[in-house]
Amino acid sequence: MEQNGNPQLIETLMSRLCQPRTTKERFRLPFDEETAAKLLKCAIAGEVSRFGGTFLYPDAVDSQVRYLAASLTSGRRYGVMLCGLCGNGKTTVMRAFQNLLNVIRIPDNYHRTVYGMPIVNAVHIAHLCRNSYTEFLRLCDMEMLGIDDMGIEPVEVQEFGNMHRPLTDLLARRYENRGFSFITTNLVPQQIRKLYGDRIADRLNEMVDKIV
């Protein structure tokens, strides 16, 4: 039924359309930057000792942790990306952050739960995209997700005759959903752009703080 002759209804609709849409808040640690850095250092030391190691704390690690603390307390991005050579502790830092979340149990008021972050290897993400697409989509839509070793997975997989680009599809969907992503990779930004294309590289620039 046409409503062209109902100015009151039109005015009501225009008022509703002009109202800001309800959006979820960006994740941030509820501490000041210095406190967050101390907690992250403790969590990293705990993660190292869990595997029988001794936590050494060179200046380079101190700088990375401070950058990480600054990012996680600011709420300015929808995630972080740890870049660097193999064996420099990126996965350890990500697991330490995961454990920190489990310990402090930050309320997620939008979903009426607490924040938590599963960690999934990029190769397994590609496996799910090919063999369990429903589970793959569930990862895409998670509020928080740790993506380990981005760049070692097959760029394309085939699922029932359909070609997919697992990490490209996942990151594009997480960009749209504004999900928090904690990513580790051995790739440098130029390699990311070459492997995943300009569109995903540009979206990652919006989504995450890159820490080398």
Pin down the residues of each PLM region:
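Hydrophobic positions on the alpha1 helix immediately C-terminal to the Walker A/P-loop
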Residues: 93, 97
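Conserved glycine(s) of the Walker
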Residues: 87-90
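Conserved nucleotide-sensing/catalytic segment adjacent to the nucleotide-binding pocket
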Residues: 109-176
